[in-house]
Design a protein with these regions (language model features):
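Short, charged, surface-exposed secondary-structure boundary motifs
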Residues: 49-56, 116
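Anionic-ligand binding patches
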Residues: 2-19, 58-175
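Surface-exposed, flexible loop/turn segments at secondary-structure boundaries
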Residues: 27, 47-49, 137
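Cofactor-binding loop segments of dinucleotide-utilizing enzymes, especially the Rossmann-like FAD-
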Residues: 24, 44, 134
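A short beta-strand-loop structural module common to alpha/beta enzyme folds
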Residues: 38-50
């Protein structure tokens, strides 16, 4: 490549905003990589449990999809204010089961209990994604998936947890 062509290519790359994933989620990283998206990862420092608890206490945004959307916006906005030229992706999920919202399990006992509670039952996963640039959200989307978890034994859960390992603690469904 000639010096002129190299300069033009470098200039074009410098003008193209980068894509930043505001998440530590291995699953989200895998999705972007498998789609061939070039990105950097800068996890947001949002305390999801505190935000969720505050919303419930105030009696606002108690619908799981709304909470997931607010968390996705909060994460993307936080990271995009520090990298204003980047297109920042924030995402979150909330799981609705019966009349309550479940969060990521805090340990393996909580994961075991959650899986045993979900087995043989239907639950709804609310997924939200937000794109931000310069601290402003430019696009959001929320979708839901209604899922039926098959019935299984407590022994199966034990084997599953030993094989899946700590990854179950990064998912609201422990799966």
């Amino acid at each position: 490549m000639t010096d002129v062509a190299s300069s033009i290519a470098a200039g074009m790359q410098a003008q193209t905003p980068g894509v930043v994933l505001a998440s530590a989620s291995p699953a989200r990283v895998a999705v972007l990589r498998s789609a061939g998206v070039a990105f950097t990862q800068k996890p947001a420092s949002v305390d999801e449990r505190s935000v969720h608890a505050a919303l419930q206490k105030e009696g606002e945004l108690t619908l799981p999809g709304d909470i997931a959307e607010l968390l996705a916006i909060t994460k993307a906005t936080e990271v995009s204010t520090g990298d204003p030229d980047a297109l920042v992706i924030g995402a979150d999920q909330m799981l609705a089961f019966e009349d309550r919202t479940l969060e990521k399990p805090v340990d393996f006992d909580a994961a075991r209990n959650q899986l045993l509670e979900l087995r043989g039952n239907t639950h709804v996963l609310h997924s939200a994604v937000c794109l931000c640039r310069g601290g402003q959200h430019v696009w959001t989307h929320v979708d839901t998936a209604t899922m039926m978890m098959r019935d299984f034994s407590p022994e199966f859960v034990g084997r599953y947890l030993s094989v899946a390992g700590a990854s179950v603690l990064t998912s609201v469904g422990a799966y």
